[in-house]
């Protein structure tokens, strides 16, 4: 197994194509939390008690914007992600699961709000709710409806 604890991030403003599903999903549903992570409302009625983190993954995990995932780390942390961008296959390993620094999950953030330790370390892994190696990524099979 790889050390997958490094978790990169990108500012949501780097997605600039106003016609793209990525841009429109983030514009419609995205908001920054107090720590600078872009989030979308969780679906309390479906048992998702926490808001989704807006993330990018390699194509191995799926390519449809709006796909939801339950992600568990080896430290026991569980968080939910919604696919808002795709890692370029050219920048990932042969199975398109992770990039050169073994990062599996990339978080979409507002760098103006992002907590300083994450900026300083260059990885969201220092934020304790996201800490640990990625143990599992489970695709959730209901369609996101805006958390209504």
Label each residue range with its predicted role:
Residues 1-148:
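Solvent-exposed, well-ordered loop and adjacent helix/strand elements within mature globular domains
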């Amino acid at each position: 197994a790889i050390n997958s604890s490094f978790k990169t991030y990108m500012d949501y403003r780097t997605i600039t194509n106003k016609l793209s599903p990525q841009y429109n999903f983030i514009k419609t549903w995205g908001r920054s939390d107090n720590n600078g992570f872009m989030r979308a409302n969780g679906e309390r009625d479906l048992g998702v008690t926490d808001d989704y983190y807006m993330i990018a993954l390699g194509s191995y995990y799926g390519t449809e914007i709006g796909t939801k995932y339950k992600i568990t780390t080896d430290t026991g942390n569980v968080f939910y992600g919604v696919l808002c961008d795709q890692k370029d296959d050219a920048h990932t390993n042969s199975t398109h699961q992770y990039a050169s620094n073994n990062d599996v999950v990339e978080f979409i953030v507002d760098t103006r709000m992002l907590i300083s330790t994450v900026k300083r370390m260059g990885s969201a892994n220092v934020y304790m709710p996201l800490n640990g190696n990625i143990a599992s990524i489970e695709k959730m099979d209901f369609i996101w409806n805006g958390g209504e």
